[in-house]
């Protein structure tokens, strides 16, 4: 039975999106997991805690005996059924626990007794995690071009269309602004970093990559922060700035934040609840920058937002949102971005409309 235990093996697993049956407890999985992993634990959180306490008080033999006692009979059979189904569904997969120790070996031996030979990751999640961290450090050393521009400039789409682009906001499940949340919850910090490492490894493996194309992000994207090694390299990177007409930016923002988000919320929750979630999403975004807008201006824009939502609900038109979106861009977002860009003006190497920047990046 082949087992994976070298750095290259670990990288190959991440590049291939090899299915990983992660037998750690749910609390461990939630703290950090690999992108292609599914959590089918040997022990649940309470069982793991009990075994851990027993280990500290009575030693390894007593803890092992307790573990076998807790995971027995119908409980063991239910978990065996889940592992067996996952193995059959993912014949190229691999088992994983925290460090490649007893848990994955126990599950492997039980599966073997049931007629299923399934490999495991020697070193477990810890080894994969260290591989992900090291890969990011190494790959971040390649040259980087950042795509900058005011809100609504289509930066994310431009990055997505580059073969050497990595969509940081897509990986973080957040668009990086007060209105940036998506319907997908953000990953834990470790899981986000693992996903980023896997994406960089896959992108690098597909081609003879000379440089990265990334969006000009701040350190935080929602609740996730960029790995320091990558963030440091981004502060030194060249910047290409998209400068599209204001009207085109408004069209993009209308599509992204009003039409698409309304569709996504109603698709996920149904018409009535979806509408309420959509309204709450917009109000939450505006409320997040209340202090910077000042109370009076915030109240004015919030009233315009309410009026726009009433119009959208009764007519289906999103045009009313321009009454609060335009001043929000002109008074807050655009001045803020231009101020930030001025501080790194020496890094700007190209300016142009979206298509011009895309062509410039393609020629790098």
Curated annotation (Swiss-Prot):
Reactions mediated catalytically: 5-methylaminomethyl-2-thiouridine(34) in tRNA + selenophosphate + (2E)-geranyl diphosphate + H2O + H(+) = 5-methylaminomethyl-2-selenouridine(34) in tRNA + (2E)-thiogeraniol + phosphate + diphosphate; 5-methylaminomethyl-2-thiouridine(34) in tRNA + (2E)-geranyl diphosphate = 5-methylaminomethyl-S-(2E)-geranyl-thiouridine(34) in tRNA + diphosphate; 5-methylaminomethyl-S-(2E)-geranyl-thiouridine(34) in tRNA + selenophosphate + H(+) = 5-methylaminomethyl-2-(Se-phospho)selenouridine(34) in tRNA + (2E)-thiogeraniol; 5-methylaminomethyl-2-(Se-phospho)selenouridine(34) in tRNA + H2O = 5-methylaminomethyl-2-selenouridine(34) in tRNA + phosphate
CDD domains: RHOD_YbbB
Assigned keywords, A-Z: Selenium, Transferase
Uppermost EC category: transferase
Consequence when changing residue 97 to S: In vivo, abolishes 2-selenouridine synthase activity. In vitro, reduces activity by only 50%
Residue ranges annotated for the Rhodanese domain, each copy included: 14-137
Disulfide bonds, paired cysteine numbers: none
Active site feature: 97 (s-selanylcysteine intermediate)
GO BP field: tRNA seleno-modification; tRNA wobble uridine modification
Alphabetized SUPFAM superfamilies for the sequence: Rhodanese/Cell cycle control phosphatase
InterPro entries with a match to the protein in the record: Rhodanese-like_dom (IPR001763), Rhodanese-like_dom_sf (IPR036873), SelU (IPR017582)
Its EC number(s): 2.9.1.3
SMART domains listed in its UniProt record: RHOD
Top-rank taxon: Bacteria
Effects seen without this gene: Disruption mutant is incapable of incorporating selenium into tRNA. Disruption does not affect 2 thiouridine generation. Mutant cannot produce geranylated RNA.
Molecular function via GO: transferase activity, transferring alkyl or aryl (other than methyl) groups; tRNA 2-selenouridine synthase activity
Family, similarity comment: Belongs to the SelU family.
Protein's job: Involved in the post-transcriptional modification of the uridine at the wobble position (U34) of tRNA(Lys), tRNA(Glu) and tRNA(Gln). Catalyzes the conversion of 2-thiouridine (S2U-RNA) to 2-selenouridine (Se2U-RNA). Acts in a two-step process involving geranylation of 2-thiouridine (S2U) to S-geranyl-2-thiouridine (geS2U) and subsequent selenation of the latter derivative to 2-selenouridine (Se2U) in the tRNA chain.
Record-linked HAMAP family: tRNA_sel_U_synth (MF_01622)
Oligomer and partners: Monomer.
Protein's name according to its UniProt entry: tRNA 2-selenouridine synthase
Gene designation per UniProt: selU
